[in-house]
Amino acid sequence: MFFGGFECDFQEAEFIVIGVPFDKTSTFKSGAKFAPNSIRKAAYNIETYSFRTNIDVDDLKIYDAGNLTTLSTVESMINGLSATISEIIKLNKIPVVIGGEHTLTYGIVKALKNCGIIIFDAHLDLRDEYPLNIKFSHATVTRRISELISCKKILCLGTRAVCK
C-alpha cells in the first residue's frame, strides 16, 4: 500500500500510516472496512501544496505500513492496534490511523494514555452496552474511552442525538 504515492522508507519516516479495515460492530450500514484503501486511492488525486499552511505533502516523510491484520474480533483489533501504535511511538514516529468504524479509537487512546481527543459524531456513543451485553461497540466507544482518560479531555462535536 502507498498513501497517495508519498512514500519513503520506514527508517527515515516521521509519519506511519496504519489502515484499520474494521466494521464488525456497525449496526446501521457496514462498509467502513473499505475506507482505508479508498482513502489511499483518493490520496493519489490530492494537490500536494497548501497555500494556507505552506506545506507540501510531497515533502512529508510518510511510510504506509499497510493494514492491521488482527481483525477477527473487537478485542484482537483493539489490542493489535494499541500494540502497533505503542511500537511506533517508541520509535519516535507519529502514527496516522485510517479506519474503519470508530471502535478503533479505543485502541488508539489505550496506546497514547495521556491524551485528549476530539470526536466528530452525530451521537455521543456513551451507552454502557450495545447491543445487550456487548461492552465494546460503535455505540459504547466514548464511554469506554472515558474509563481510560478524564472526561475533561474528550470533546464531542456535531452531536444531534443521545440516549438517556
List each model region and its residues.
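Conserved alpha-helical scaffold segments that buttress catalytic/binding sites
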Residues: 1-164
